[in-house]
Regions:
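Acidic-basic catalytic patches of nuclease active cores, encompassing PD-(D/E)XK
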Residues: 1-32
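Short loop/turn and capping residues at structural boundaries
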Residues: 33-34, 91
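Short acidic/glycine-enriched loop/turn segments that link adjacent beta-strands
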Residues: 36-40
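A short acidic (Asp/Glu
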Residues: 41-43, 100
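Active-site beta-strand-loop-beta-strand hairpin of nuclease catalytic cores
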Residues: 43-55
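Short beta-strand-loop-alpha-helix junction that forms the active-site gateway
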Residues: 54-67
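Domain-level recognition of nuclease-like catalytic cores that cleave nucleotide substrates
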Residues: 86-125
């Protein structure tokens, strides 16, 4: 029986992909938050002890995972500046290979669109 992934499970799947990418890039995890709509998902530091707030956003394909709410991001950038952190954005698109109207199922193949981490300039607009 096919069991469709919940929004939280889709979010966790996206976070797993991004977390592996962050590890490969040499980031050290300070905090991880996997709750939906709770930001940032990752607080990391690099080898120079610079803090990074990482936002992970999952969308269902064909929606573009690289797009984000610019107005909301301004508020988040302010939060990062107050904490001497830089902002990274990771958009992840997931889809069912058998059709974009079908859900993504547990333990089944899925499509992924992930173009890596985007550095978000923290200068306020």
């Amino acid at each position: 029986m096919n069991v469709a992934l919940t929004k939280q499970e889709l979010h966790n799947l996206a976070m797993n992909h991004v977390g592996k990418d962050l590890e490969k890039r040499g980031f050290e995890f300070i905090a991880i938050n996997s709750k939906l709509k709770k930001h940032p998902q990752f607080v990391c530091i690099d080898k120079n002890s610079q803090y990074f707030f990482v936002i992970v956003r999952v969308v269902i394909l064909p929606e573009n995972p690289n797009n984000y709410d610019v107005v909301w991001m301004e508020t988040f950038k302010k939060h990062a500046l107050e904490n001497d952190a830089k902002v990274l954005y990771a958009g992840v698109g997931l889809g069912n290979p058998e059709g974009e109207d079908l859900p993504i199922y547990l333990n089944k193949e899925y499509l992924i669109e992930y173009n890596g981490i985007q550095f978000i300039e923290t200068n306020l607009n």
